[in-house]
A protein has these predicted regions:
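Catalytic pocket-lining loop regions of alpha/beta-barrel enzymes
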Residues: 34-37, 83-208
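Short catalytic/ligand-binding loop motif for oxyanion handling, primarily in non-cytosolic enzymes
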Residues: 21-22, 76-79, 138, 158-161, ...
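Active-site beta-loop-alpha junctions enriched in small/polar residues
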Residues: 17-18, 46-50, 71-75, 106-110, ...
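Mid-to-C-terminal alpha-helical segments outside catalytic/metal-binding sites
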Residues: 1-11, 97, 197, 201-207, ...
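Active-site gating/metal-coordination segments in enzymes
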Residues: 10, 18-104, 173-176
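Generic structural signal for hydrophobic
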Residues: 3-7, 58-61, 69, 96, ...
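Well-ordered, non-membrane alpha-helical segments in soluble/globular domains
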Residues: 1, 22-29, 85-89, 112-114, ...
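Divalent metal-coordination and catalytic microenvironments
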Residues: 12, 43, 69, 96, ...
């Protein structure tokens, strides 16, 4: 929150993490964050640890507290081996659809068919996909499912031929800053090569994200470089697409009641 005004942040997604036995504490913490941020943080509840009955009750008694469900990380230990179209998750999406909630997920590798099946069965739910595992199949998914969206963030910043984002392959702030500044043009040109055509095929469903990881990735010096890169990349998109990708798509999806394309 301290950097919101300094970095001119209009809004962001915040994940609300809890467990069923501590539901009351989870809701109180979420209410506090929403109030302290003056609504700039759109809260997503991680739904996989709650029963369907609890999710329905939360929405009944706390309408408007959460803008979506997620992040559901299918690549991560707790969900590893589960599929986005397992019945457990289809039940969650049904609650999301009833309450106009976005569903954000980070699928594991080769789960595009499972994601597509979930999107097909829930056409009234907006699915915000995140993560490099869906980078190759995302266009085909968007072609087939108008309710699929995608956020791009650190995976834009790569040094060829590495598949990993520089923000995650760097060991510390100093290493990141040195590598970033020495290879800025290489990083930017690769990002344009990888993403420009895709974004312009579906200009209303891609959005710029700011996902980070270790504590040092939130350092002000790092933030300045990420902002510089984001602006430089956006400037390489067609003028009619730039604002959409930068913030309009995200605001329409999340900040304005989940209205989509």
């Amino acid at each position: 929150l301290c950097n919101f005004d300094k970095e001119k942040v209009r809004g962001t997604i915040g994940f609300s993490i809890g467990i069923e036995p501590l539901l009351e504490e989870t809701l109180k913490a979420a209410e506090s964050v929403k109030m302290d941020s003056s609504g700039k943080i759109s809260l997503f509840l991680m739904p996989q640890v709650f029963s369907t009955e609890s999710l329905e009750s939360i929405e009944t008694t706390n309408k408007g507290l959460f803008a979506g469900y997620g992040e559901i990380a299918f690549y991560f230990v707790a969900q590893k081996g589960q599929n986005p179209d397992d019945q457990k998750y289809l039940d969650i999406y049904e609650v999301a659809g009833k309450n106009n909630l976005v569903v954000m997920m980070h699928p594991d590798a080769r789960q595009e068919n499972s994601v597509g099946n979930a999107a097909r069965k829930n056409p009234n739910v907006k699915f915000l996909i995140h993560g490099p595992e869906m980078e190759d199949p995302i266009i085909n998914m968007m072609n087939n499912h108008p309710n699929v969206y995608y956020s791009i963030d650190a995976i834009l910043i790569r040094i060829p031929p590495s598949p990993g984002g520089l923000l995650y392959t760097s060991n510390n702030k100093e290493e990141f800053i040195l590598t970033f500044t020495e290879n800025f043009d290489v990083l930017l040109n690769r990002a344009v090569k990888d993403w420009k055509e895709k974004i312009e095929q579906h200009p209303d469903r891609f959005m710029w994200g700011t996902d980070r990881a270790h504590k040092w990735t939130y350092d002000e010096e790092v933030s300045v470089l990420l902002e510089e890169f984001g602006r430089a990349f956006i400037a390489r998109l067609e003028p009619a697409v730039q604002k959409k990708f930068a913030y309009e798509n995200a605001e329409r999806l999340i900040g304005m009641g989940g209205e989509g394309e």
